[in-house]
Amino acid sequence: MRILIITGLSGSGKSTAVRALEDEGFFCQDNLPVALFPTFVDLVDNAKERIRDVALVMDIRGRDFNKGFEKVFQEITEAGHLVDILFFDATDEVIIRRFSETRRRHPAIDSGSVPEGIRSERQQLAGLRSFATQIIDTSELNVHQLKDLVISLVKGGEGGREMTVHLQSFGYRFGLPLESDLVMDVRFLPNPYFIPELKEFSGLDPKVRAYVLKHDETGEFLTKFKELLEFLLPGYKREGKSYLTISIGCTGGRHRSVVIAEEIRDFFKRKQLNLKVSHRDMEKG
């Protein structure tokens, strides 16, 4: 049986994720005490009607969530079940805005402000976050994009936990992507931004791509970066990692990082992996 543990900050999109999983045929259980996880899994596993996919929501509403979760996860895994922990996160500013829109009280505090609740919740969830299989930053996602991402994660993990690679470009000016497993800084490469006839185009434009790739340091970097990925990917697969996020950053996220991400896309196409490519800040930079 495949089990997804859905956890993370209040206001980060867990409810949306659960609805997406229900649409994909997952049996979902919300707010179950951690101590009851093994019993619940046994009951579902022995049910007359075979259930293959289960999602359990675990957050601060269950007051004992911080007690013994490591042991509980170990018990479930040793019973032969595939367990992935999806931790949903977002920036404080985005969560504050979402609470303001819904006018809900933050569940981490009985009184006080939403920012205080967020700080408290981050502290309480720090240990659980370290166990996450995948950290999902929903700050820049709308409801439909989040549902699509969750579904791609689920489908990418089917069939023997085949690994899905999310390759994204970004701009340091707009902050690091929280969900990154690997971050590569390409700000040392020649910058088309300072070439007047290239400045207004993105890294998807053939002229910008040709400019970045014609320099010797770009070719040498790509060779070494691909060698690093050749070394790392088998290790991540052996670990059982089902989703790998590689973030490539330049100053504004419009030129160099886009070119390099597209070059690495071609490299991954030959690896028979599930591949998702996005350019987070291309239209901002």
Curated annotation (Swiss-Prot):
Positions that bind ATP: G8, L9, S10, G11, S12, G13, K14, S15
Domain of life: Bacteria
Pfam families in the record: PapZ_C, RapZ-like_N
Gene3D superfamilies named in the record: P-loop containing nucleotide triphosphate hydrolases
InterPro entries with a match to the protein in the record: P-loop_NTPase, RapZ-like, RapZ-like_N, RapZ_C
GO molecular function, one term: GTP binding
Parts forming coiled coils: none
Residues the entry annotates as binding GTP: D59, I60, R61, G62
Protein keywords: ATP-binding, GTP-binding, Nucleotide-binding
Family as reported in the entry's similarity comment: Belongs to the RapZ-like family.
Role noted for this protein: Displays ATPase and GTPase activities.
Cited HAMAP family: RapZ_like (MF_00636)
Name of this chain's protein: Nucleotide-binding protein Geob_2284
Source organism (scientific name): Geotalea daltonii (strain DSM 22248 / JCM 15807 / FRC-32)
